[in-house]
Each structure stands twice: as structure tokens, then as C-alpha cells.
Curated annotation (Swiss-Prot):
Molecular functions (GO terms): S-adenosylmethionine-dependent methyltransferase activity
SUPFAM superfamilies: S-adenosyl-L-methionine-dependent methyltransferases
Keywords of the record: Antibiotic biosynthesis, Methyltransferase, S-adenosyl-L-methionine, Transferase
EC category name: transferase
Alphabetized InterPro entries for the sequence: Erg6_SMT_methyltransf, MeTfrase_dom, Methyltransf_11, SAM-dependent_MTases_sf
Any Gene Ontology biological process: antibiotic biosynthetic process
Annotated protein name in UniProt: Methyltransferase GfsG
Active site: E146 (proton acceptor)
Miscellaneous information on this protein: The macrolide antibiotics FD-891 and FD-892 induce morphological changes of human promyelocytic leukemia (HL-60) cells and have cytocidal activity against tumor cell lines in vitro. FD-891 produced by Streptomyces sp. MAFF 225003 and MAFF 225006 inhibits growth of rice and alfalfa seedlings and may cause russet scab in potatoes.
EC number of the protein: 2.1.1.-
């Protein structure tokens, strides 16, 4: 356990590192992904739909799995700059709480809900998913969109999400994973991607059922959408050029290679899963 910060949340060293990364990279990430700050979903991977449109479809994929209704309390673990949380509140009438370790992203998220008139239904906390500052059985629904890659201990985070989820509640996760067997070359590519993304590690897709079970949850669905998300790689590459003033041409080229190599990797994976609390 790390020291409590001023907002009463327990932060470990890696969570602080992730928060610092998102504080510093916020504008880059918004240039890369638009305000969704997550991968896109292409039903036809050969299509040329823009990333902004595909990003909205990814949010919809999670929404369809959560079955959210008006009156539900929803937790968004790793909420980014708050666009999916605001979208969900508008779409369903639910009350949404976002948790994030980046102060800069939270500032943007709070400005968003103020400008959209959603302050009565959407709020945000500086909070570490390893030690969620909420009482047991607090939420009807939880989603975690691409935040699991930053978690030092996925078992701990799964237990925490299960703890704050009410009996009968539902959890949806979107996560970047690996598939198949990784040789030395693939391992090096994954390590380069993790360094670039400040990811602790990538889980193997085959390990997720056990993670869900150990947390005391029932796995309802696990879908491999690797090919439907792979177009995110080339769609994002041009945005790295905004780093030219700070990294120079060589640094940007290295970053593009680390990013592009991951999406070229056969073992690249992306999973959508839904779990329920008995």
C-alpha cells in the first residue's frame, strides 16, 4: 500500500507513474484517439472508417454488454477525459462515477460534464483502481476500457471491482492482450509497446477466465475482437508527429516503430468480456 494522497486515495509507485504519464501525454493521446482515448472497433477490418467513428463504436460495444438502465450507478475505472462516461449518462440516464489517476485528464473530464450540463449525473474521483475508495456493493455496473494494462496486480483490481459491484451487477472489460505463443521476437515487440504505453504488462487472453473466477465473478461472455481493433494501429501513427518538437525525428521514428510493430504482430490481441456478480 502506498501513502494516501490529498484526496484520500491509496497510490502505489506505479500508479503514480501512470498518472504522470497521462498528465504529460494528455494532449498527444487526444490527438491520437480523439476524446475517447481508446481503440476503435471496425466490424469490417478492411474498411477505412475514421478512428473517431470507430472509437464511438467501441464505446457502444461496451454499452451493449453492460445493459445499463436509468437509475443504475455505474463506475468507469480509468475514465480518461470522461467522454464515454458522459456518453453513457446521456444515453441511459444512469449516474456515472469516473475513477482516474491523472489529474490533468480529470480536469478535462470535469470541464466536459459542466459544459454538457451533466454535473448532476456524472462525477469524477482521483482514485487508484488497486484501492478503490468506495464501499462494498456500491455500483450496479462497472466498465474498464483499456485500463487493465496499467494495473500492477490484475487479481487485486478484479477483487476490488468485484467488491464494489452489487450482487446481480455486471462488469465489462475491454483489454489489450496477447494470444498464442510468444517467441523472443514477439516478446521484444510486446515489451517495446509496454514501455511506450507505460503498460505494466499484457495479459494472455487465455488467462482471463481464471482472473474472473478468482474474483468471485461469473464469466458471461469473452469475445476476441483482435482483428476488429487492429486498424487502430495505422490510424494512430500520423499523430506521433506532434512529438517532433520534443523527441526529434529519430525519437518519433522509434515510437512509431514500437507502436506499429505491435499491431503487425500476429499475437496482438484485444478482448471484450462481461462478468456478473452472483
Amino acid at each position: 500500500m502506498g501513502p494516501a494522497n490529498s484526496e484520500g486515495t491509496m497510490f502505489d509507485a506505479f500508479s503514480r507513474e501512470v498518472g504522470d504519464y497521462y498528465d504529460q501525454a494528455n494532449e498527444l493521446l487526444r490527438a491520437m484517439f480523439t476524446d475517447n482515448v481508446h481503440y476503435g472497433y471496425w466490424p469490417d477490418p478492411s474498411s477505412i472508417d475514421p478512428l473517431a467513428e470507430a472509437g464511438e463504436r467501441m464505446t457502444e460495444q461496451l454499452y451493449e454488454r453492460l445493459d445499463v438502465s436509468a437509475g443504475h450507478k455505474v463506475l468507469d475505472v480509468g475514465c480518461g477525459v470522461g467522454k464515454p462516461a458522459a456518453w453513457l449518462a446521456r444515453k441511459t440516464g444512469a449516474t456515472v462515477k469516473g475513477a482516474n489517476v491523472s489529474r490533468n485528464q480529470l480536469e478535462v473530464a470535469r470541464d466536459r460534464v459542466r459544459s454538457e450540463g451533466l454535473e448532476d449525473r456524472v462525477s469524477f474521483d482521483l482514485a487508484d483502481a488497486m484501492h478503490l475508495p468506495y464501499a462494498d456493493d456500491s455500483f450496479d455496473r462497472i466498465w474498464a476500457i483499456e485500463s487493465m494494462i496499467h494495473m500492477p496486480d490484475r487479481d487485486q483490481v478484479m477483487r476490488e471491482m468485484a467488491r464494489v459491484l452489487r450482487p446481480g451487477g455486471r462488469l465489462a472489460i475491454a483489454d489489450i492482450v496477447v494470444r498464442g505463443t510468444l517467441d523472443d521476437v514477439a516478446t521484444a515487440v510486446v515489451e517495446g509497446f509496454c514501455t511506450l504505453s507505460t503498460a505494466r504488462s499484457l495479459e494472455h487472453i487465455d488467462n482471463y477466465p481464471a482472473l474472473v473466477e478468482k474474483a468471485g465473478l461469473d464469466l458471461l461472455e469473452l469475445t476476441d475482437v483482435s482483428e476488429q481493433t487492429r486498424p487502430t494501429g495505422p490510424a494512430v501513427l500520423p499523430a506521433f508527429d506532434v512529438l517532433l518538437p520534443t523527441l526529434g525525428e529519430e525519437g518519433v521514428a522509434q515510437s512509431k516503430k514500437a507502436w506499429g510493430d505491435m499491431f503487425d504482430l500476429p499475437q496482438y490481441g484485444y478482448v471484450l468480456l462481461t462478468a456478473g456478480k452472483p
